[in-house]
């Protein structure tokens, strides 16, 4: 008795700790697409006194066992046994290697960590059937010296699979619909294909009788489990297989005796929360488990005889981590079914949804709305952003607020560097001159207050662009002479023709200065003198009109495109048109008229 008590008091604590809740390892994805899953933990040992050990090790072993018996008239006893057992995974850790010499562990606490990456195609745990199973066990061993017994600690762990996030085929609604000619048209659907063991399956029925006075009787719902076992070396070394079908759950509704041209109802089929009653879907080497929903609808015909409508839907059952928790966690599977089995919205119901406006506008990848001329699909229900003034103002306010938030403390908005966030705002240019050199230097700075996002986002229509004659000048044009300035300088550098008065010069690329009253009087007197001279010398009126037309062209050497107020009807050779052009240009008094 003293020896036994001494053995028990050597270690006050000896356990295998797994870094997973409920000792449950969840593998994300199916066997053909899952990534490696980590398994880690530690072996903890608390010694009350010093002991002498040879080695300390840990071993992870996964075993698969398939066994069943079947009657056989040729075998004594009438039973033929098929059995196969093999190791599906094995991993060893040596914490204290065996070297032949003993090692003394003093009293205290010891912890030996372990870690392994389990392959994605590893077989998951299968438990609950007597004929087959796949189990994983951790076994820690401490080999002691002399007559002391070996210290062994075992821990059972489970490996389960969870559906990947991109498994769309398991989250979509599945249904079966058909028409029984001259009898009934039916649709039976479930919201998703995959369900958690311990939850429930909502089943929706839509029945439309095609025969007058046809009524719906009882509706039967049954969940079937199909198990297929196979061994490569069974009785006498021969391969053998076995198919087994069992009923997991069943439900039957009451008869619908009332007459109607449309029946629609939903029934919930609760799933068991025990692996003994229901297993998960799996496809392993030698073990295959599938599930199906079977439906049977009784139809009462007008003549009194009963017809039966049958249909089936395949479903996938998965093991949830909550199944191994306490009772409250298991009950949450049914209470929170909508969060576990919420199907994704269909494309038809979501294609016209408006984007969420509460996001940050700092990383916009799309340009601002281009205006009412943006192409748009016919009969489209999508929002028209060009006509939505509130949305445009909200966008401008958000961009301006973001620019102010990104400014460092102590800096004005004009001191923003364009290299910080070049995509936030279009740059605003400030042109200055270098007083020391006299050369103009362009200092590009960002100024959100001077930038009109509303103007930048507007694109004129084709009609407005073709009618507008005012050129859109860039702020950089002031550093280099424009084409109009060069043409005007060349025109002024030429010697003036005799009898031609130089018109007032243009002071800016976008407008002209009207002539003064003295200039108009000098022009009137000069034209009167020329007319009297031409009359006395025999000059024809065509020469006079040509000189007036030349005077009109000299006042605008760049053509009518640079001066929008110039009439486009002025042409050389027409005396009336030349006078009208000069009068409209305010270069002739209103009382001046053509003299014959």
From Swiss-Prot:
The modification Phosphothreonine is found at residues 373-374, 502, 507. This is Arrestin domain-containing protein C31A2.12. The lineage of its organism: Eukaryota, Fungi, Dikarya, Ascomycota, Taphrinomycotina. It holds the Pfam family Arrestin_C. Residues 363-387, 405-446, 493-596 are annotated as: Disordered. It comes from Schizosaccharomyces pombe (strain 972 / ATCC 24843) (Fission yeast). Belongs to the arrestin family. The modification Phosphoserine is found at residues 452, 474, 493, 497, 514. The chain crosses the membrane at residues 194-211.
């Amino acid at each position: 008795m003293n020896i036994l008590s001494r053995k028990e008091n050597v270690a006050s604590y000896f356990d295998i700790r797994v870094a997973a809740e409920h000792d449950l390892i969840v593998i994300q994805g199916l066997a053909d697409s899952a990534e490696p899953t980590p398994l880690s933990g530690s072996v903890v040992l608390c010694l009350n006194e010093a002991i002498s050990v040879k080695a300390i090790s840990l071993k992870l072993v996964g075993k698969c066992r398939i066994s069943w018996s079947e009657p056989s008239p040729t075998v004594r006893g009438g039973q033929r046994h098929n059995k196969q057992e093999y190791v599906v995974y094995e991993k060893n850790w040596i914490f204290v290697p065996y070297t032949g010499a003993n090692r003394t562990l003093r009293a205290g606490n010891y912890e030996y960590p372990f870690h392994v990456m389990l392959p994605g195609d590893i077989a998951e745990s299968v438990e609950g059937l007597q004929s087959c199973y796949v189990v994983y066990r951790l076994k820690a061993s401490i080999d002691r010296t002399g007559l002391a017994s070996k210290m062994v600690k075992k821990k059972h762990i489970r490996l389960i699979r969870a559906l990947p996030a991109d498994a769309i085929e398991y989250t979509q609604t599945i249904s079966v619909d058909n028409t029984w000619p001259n009898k009934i048209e039916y649709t039976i659907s479930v919201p998703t294909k995959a369900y958690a063991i311990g939850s429930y399956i909502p089943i929706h029925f839509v029945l439309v009788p095609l025969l007058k006075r046809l009524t719906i009787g009882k509706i039967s719902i049954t969940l079937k489990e199909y198990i297929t076992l196979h061994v490569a070396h069974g009785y006498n070394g021969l391969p053998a297989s076995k198919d087994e079908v069992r009923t997991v759950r069943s439900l039957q509704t009451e008869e619908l005796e009332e007459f109607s041209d449309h029946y629609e109802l939903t029934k919930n089929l609760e799933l068991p929360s025990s692996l003994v009653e229901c297993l998960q879907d799996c496809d392993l080497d030698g073990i295959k488990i599938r599930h199906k929903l079977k439906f049977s609808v009784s139809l009462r015909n007008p003549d009194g005889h009963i017809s039966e409508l049958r249909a089936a839907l395949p479903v996938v059952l998965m093991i949830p981590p909550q199944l191994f928790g306490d009772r409250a966690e298991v009950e949450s599977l049914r209470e929170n079914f909508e969060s576990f089995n919420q199907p994704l919205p269909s494309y038809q119901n979501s294609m016209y949804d408006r984007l969420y406006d509460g996001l940050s506008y700092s990383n916009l990848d799309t340009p601002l709305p281009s205006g009412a001329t943006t192409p748009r699909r016919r009969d489209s229900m999508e929002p028209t952003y060009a006509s939505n003034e509130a949305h445009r103002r909200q966008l401008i306010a958000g961009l301006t607020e973001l620019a102010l938030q990104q400014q460092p403390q102590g800096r004005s908005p004009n001191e923003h560097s364009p290299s910080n966030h070049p995509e936030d705002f279009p740059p605003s240019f400030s042109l200055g001159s270098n007083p020391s050199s006299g050369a103009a230097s362009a200092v590009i700075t960002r100024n959100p207050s001077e930038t009109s996002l509303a103007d930048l986002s507007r694109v004129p229509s084709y009609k407005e662009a073709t009618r507008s004659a005012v050129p859109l000048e860039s702020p950089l044009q002031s550093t280099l002479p424009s084409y109009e300035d060069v043409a005007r300088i060349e025109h002024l550098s030429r010697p003036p023709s005799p009898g031609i008065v130089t018109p007032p010069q243009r002071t800016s690329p976008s407008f002209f200065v009207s002539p003064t009253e003295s200039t108009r009087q000098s022009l009137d007197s000069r034209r009167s003198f020329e007319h009297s001279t031409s009359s006395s010398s025999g000059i024809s009126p065509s020469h006079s009109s040509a000189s007036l037309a030349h005077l009109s062209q000299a006042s605008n050497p760049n053509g009518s495109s640079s001066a929008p107020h110039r009439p486009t009807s002025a042409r050389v050779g027409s005396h009336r048109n030349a006078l009208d052009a000069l009068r409209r240009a305010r270069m002739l008094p209103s009382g001046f008229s053509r003299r014959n």
